[in-house]
């Protein structure tokens, strides 16, 4: 089962109520928040509704492991540690990332927060900024595998 990485690019000002509600369901409450969601039909419908505020794509194991290692949280103030992962039966962040992508476990089952607070990406979003689609040189919309580059720059 593939996982989508959904990254909120635009802020909270002048967003229609129905789109704001959809963004909350996707767990991207603020700018530069990222959430990990399964690739299902209902999630894809929500993504299409909020496509003018987010960018998304399929996350790979290496990027997911790095994201969990550096930005994973158990609670608001507690970082995700290797000791916590070992308590849950995984030997490394890479093993956990592989299990998540294969669909064997979920973040909720492990008690890990399903969203990540990131920094703005180094070198920016794109030449044309945050108001244009990715295909036009901007930041919004579907990126596919290139979402991994954006995530690594924002960690």
Swiss-Prot record:
Name listed for the protein in its UniProt record: Large ribosomal subunit protein uL30
GO MF annotation terms: RNA binding; structural constituent of ribosome
Keywords: Ribonucleoprotein, Ribosomal protein
Disulfide bonds: none
Oligomer status and interactors: Part of the 50S ribosomal subunit.
Top-level taxon in the UniProt lineage: Archaea
Family, per entry: Belongs to the universal ribosomal protein uL30 family.
GO cellular component, one term: cytosolic large ribosomal subunit
NCBIfam families: PRK06049.1, uL30_arch
UniProt-listed Pfam families: Ribosomal_L30
Example of a GO biological process term: maturation of LSU-rRNA from tricistronic rRNA transcript (SSU-rRNA, 5.8S rRNA, LSU-rRNA)
Entry annotated with the keyword Ribosomal protein: yes
Organism per entry: Nanoarchaeum equitans (strain Kin4-M)
UniProt keyword Iron, yes or no: no
InterPro entries in the cross-refs: Ribo_uL30_ferredoxin-like_sf, Ribosomal_uL30, Ribosomal_uL30_arc, Ribosomal_uL30_euk_arc, Ribosomal_uL30_ferredoxin-like
């Amino acid at each position: 089962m593939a996982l989508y990485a959904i990254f909120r690019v635009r802020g909270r000002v002048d967003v229609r109520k129905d789109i704001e509600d959809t963004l909350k369901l996707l767990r991207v409450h603020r700018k530069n928040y990222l959430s990990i969601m399964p690739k299902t039909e209902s999630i894809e419908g929500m993504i299409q509704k909020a496509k003018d505020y987010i960018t998304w794509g399929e996350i790979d194991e290496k990027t997911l492991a790095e994201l969990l290692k550096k930005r994973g949280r158990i609670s608001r103030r507690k970082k995700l540690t290797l000791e916590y992962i070992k308590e849950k039966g995984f030997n490394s962040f890479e093993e956990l990332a592989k299990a998540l992508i294969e669909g064997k476990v979920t973040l909720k089952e492990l008690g890990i927060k399903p969203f990540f607070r990131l920094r703005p990406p180094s070198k920016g979003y794109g030449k044309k900024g945050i108001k244009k689609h990715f295909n036009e040189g901007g930041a919004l919309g579907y990126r596919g595998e290139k979402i991994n580059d954006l995530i690594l720059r924002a960690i």
